[in-house]
Structures are given as C-alpha cells and as structure tokens.
C-alpha cells in the first residue's frame, strides 16, 4: 500500500489562512509574499510549519491560489541536474524528479540533495523501458528495483511512479503499488532542444493545477525551465511538488490510479 511521506496537513494549513482572511468557502486563499525580482520560496507556505503569514496574496480569478507542478524525467545527470537544482534554489522553487534507477549509482548525493531541498523524488523505471505488457517479475525488475535503490539512498519508499512515454495499461495499474503521475503540459523538450520554443509552449499553455513535463538531462531544458519559472512567477503562479499540488486541492493520491492534473 502506498504510504504518503509525512507532510504537514495542507488542508489545515489552508484553513488556518482562510480563517485569517475571513474566508468561509471550502477553498481558502493561499497567502504568499513575492519580493522582486523572483518569488522567494514559493512552497514555503506549503512546507514550513509555524511561520508568520506572509503579506500579499496570489490567487486565481475565483480566489484560489494558482498552483503548478514542474516535473523532470530521465535524471539524474550530474552536470545538468545540479545546475537545475542550483537555479531552482535561487528561485525558491520546488519540483518533482522522476529518476532512472541505473543512473543513481555515483549520483546518490544529487538525489539526497533533491530530498533535503524539499523536492519530490519519484520512479521512472530502471532503464526507461515500456512497462506495458510486462510480467509481474519484469515489472518489479523495473519499478521495485528502482524503488529499493531510492529507499537505500533516502530511507523511505514513498515514491510516485511515472511510466516511460506515459503509456499505460491495466497491468501497470495493478502492479504499481503507488500513484501514477502523467502530465497535462508536454513541450517535447527532448525533440529539438529549442529553448525559446519550449518556453513559449509551456507559458502559453500554463493553467492553474497543471503538471508540466520536462527533462533535466538537456542544458537547453534547464535554461528553459528557469525562463518558464521566471515568466510564470510574473503571472502569479506558485511552483509546488506533485504531492503538494494534490494535497492543497484536497485530492487524494491513490495507489494504482493515474493523475494528469489537479485542475480546479
């Protein structure tokens, strides 16, 4: 059974802010301070307990906070992933990384850094094979093997799964043992590694509750990610992990179920 990592009770956090704002609806506005030039610690309100309520508000048109999840597949690759982590740290942004098992060796410190800096870590199989049609034994060699490697590094096994290519079947749902995360925005950054095109496609498609798919193994994608963050910050978006996105919307993540977005 999927056991969620021990995060704060987001509903209670949001409810507390709602009371401070005098909100009576089930959805309460998320309060966040945004000092220029970039948002500092987007997810701080969602991750830090006991902090003072910040001063300014970022909401969508119906009063809900505009949340979006940035996710990266196929890492870790030391050169590009560490550069990405540096830039995300400068911007106070949390992301979700779906990792390849065979690339974990000699990158354990990179994975620990992800976890320590508040990012979410997930499974992207051992060597990026299609999971459809696999026997339980072969499926476990891809997913459970990677899960165990991550557990050895991080000390827990609360990981989401993203199947390569986003291809699904009933066998994956039966065997996953955890929630399955797809996406709602795919700029196909792997195709031509065109930074400008990727940025424009993501920014023009951005929507409250979206999950963005990118890859942290291309320098062009790393550059694009920074530009996307900076531009969407200007539009009032808050970047959170996948689990934070669903928890803030009071949407449960269940083992064997597939999720592509958390649209209001």
Predicted regions and their residues:
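Active-site beta->alpha N-cap acidic-glycine motif
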Residues: 39-145, 149, 156-157
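Residues at alpha-helix termini
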Residues: 90, 116, 152, 174-178, ...
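Alpha-helical scaffold elements lining the catalytic groove of polysaccharide deacetylases
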Residues: 80, 129-156, 167-208, 221-224
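Structural recognition of the beta-strand scaffold that forms the well-ordered cores
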Residues: 68-71, 95-99, 120-123, 159-162, ...
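Solvent-exposed loop/turn segments at secondary-structure junctions
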Residues: 74-78, 102-105, 121, 127-130, ...
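Short low-complexity, flexible loop/linker segments enriched in glycine and/or proline
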Residues: 111-113, 137-139, 196-197, 254-259
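Terminal accessory/targeting
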Residues: 1-69, 86-96, 208-264
């Amino acid at each position: 059974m999927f056991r969620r990592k021990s995060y704060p009770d987001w509903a209670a956090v949001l409810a507390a802010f709602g009371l401070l704002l005098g909100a009576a609806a089930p959805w309460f506005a998320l309060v966040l301070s945004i000092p220029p030039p970039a948002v500092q610690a987007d997810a701080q309100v969602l991750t830090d307990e006991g902090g003072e309520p910040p001063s300014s508000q970022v909401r969508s048109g119906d009063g809900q906070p505009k949340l979006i999840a940035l996710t990266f597949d196929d890492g870790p690759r030391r050169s590009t992933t560490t550069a990405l982590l540096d830039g995300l740290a400068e911007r106070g942004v949390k992301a979700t990384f779906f990792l390849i098992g065979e690339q974990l060796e000699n990158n354990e410190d990179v994975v620990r850094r992800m976890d320590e800096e508040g990012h979410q870590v997930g499974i992207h199989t051992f060597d990026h094979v299609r999971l459809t049609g696999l026997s339980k034994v072969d499926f476990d060699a891809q997913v459970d093997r990677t899960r165990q490697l991550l557990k050895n590094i991080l000390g827990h096994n609360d990981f989401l799964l993203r199947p390569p290519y986003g291809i699904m079947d009933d066998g994956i749902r039966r065997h996953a043992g955890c929630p399955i995360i797809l996406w709602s925005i795919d700029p196909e950054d792997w195709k031509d590694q065109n930074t400008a095109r990727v940025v424009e496609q993501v920014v023009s498609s951005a929507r409250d509750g979206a999950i963005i798919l990118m890859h942290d193994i291309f320098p062009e994608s790393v550059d694009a990610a920074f530009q996307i963050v900076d531009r969407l910050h200007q539009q009032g978006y808050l970047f959170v992990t996948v689990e934070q996105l669903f928890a803030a919307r009071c949407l449960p993540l269940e083992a064997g179920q597939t999720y592509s977005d958390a649209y209001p």
